[in-house]
Amino acid sequence: QQQLILRVATAYFNVLTAEDTLEADQTALEAISRQLDQATTRFDVGLIAITDVEDAKAARDTAAATVIADKRALATSEDQLQEITGEKYDRLAKPGIDMPLLNPEPADESRWVDISLEQNPTLISSRLAADIARDNVRVAVGGHLPSIDILAGRSYTYNTSDETVEGLTFNGVDNKINDRQITLQLTVPLFAGGYTQSKVRQAQYLWIAAKEGVVQSSRATERQARDAYLGVISGIAHVQALRQALESNQTALKATEAGYEVGTRTSVDLLNARRNLVQAQTNFAVARYDYIVSVLTLRLAAGTLDRPELTSVNTWLTTSAPTSPAIETPATLAPTVPPADAPKPQNRR
């Protein structure tokens, strides 16, 4: 059940990642398309060279191809979620902008490892398998030992016959025999062609393999607990850093737009600024999803990923409140048209 919860959660956030990626790339495509229109207008009035138009066109085509790939990725992730849950979802809740970033409690990596080694369901299953394998060895060894069986039986006979006693014949005499037996049977195995010894060796090897499985499972559980704990800790810092990076890229795009309008920044600079903002948006969203999955993975390692824990995480999600810092849509740059008497610069083709 705990593994299923994590599988569903991972597939769920994969869908959200695909949605956010598609949304960001579509926004970028729209902005780049506007930039291409503006570049074409500026080229027509002689303000820029044809290279700026070609750069914008190439960026527009690349963005369009990216959107097509994003749609395919979104459809695939939705199908994977539907495969697990058996349901098709029109809308999924996303983390709100005020989603809490909570440190693990207890805030001690070694304590989480101890809890995991004690409660991890996979490790517990491995230990039970080893115990069963050990008992099977005892059963196989018992094939060499004498055995005592208690056999009990009862027979009842009834018939009718004629009997002659001292010259007198009696017809229809009933004969009844009621017999009871209890027997102790001792069986001493002498030689069975090596069958019993082979069964013992097989059981012993299976027991050894089961014990090795416990060791391997213990190591994997410890690694999973440490990795998930560090994933939560680093995930908090990662989300905070990427949120700041998102705001910085928004500011950088505004500055680049202003520079492009007055001619101090090129169209390539503007395209790069847009790409950086789109990447920052996607990275911020993915980091938050990764943080939530790390929280659930840590709970899985500790064997505490249950319905109440899932309900608690579900309170972080919303379908109405903003899910990311406000990103202002870049203003459309109006082409600067020179006065009628201004000299027209030569266009380089």
Regions found by a protein language model. Give the residues of each.
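Periplasmic alpha-helical coiled-coil/stalk elements that build and connect Gram-negative outer-membrane
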Residues: 3-115, 231, 235, 255-258, ...
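Amphipathic alpha-helical coiled-coil segments
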Residues: 4-23, 34, 41, 77, ...
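A small-residue-enriched
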Residues: 6, 78, 83, 87, ...
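Residue-level recognition of short, well-ordered coil/turn positions
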Residues: 47, 121, 264-265, 304
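Short, electropositive, low-hydrophobicity segments enriched in small/polar residues
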Residues: 50, 90, 197, 267, ...
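Short beta-strand/turn micro-motifs at beta-sheet edges
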Residues: 99-103, 171-175, 220
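Acidic, low-complexity, intrinsically disordered peripheral segments
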Residues: 283-349
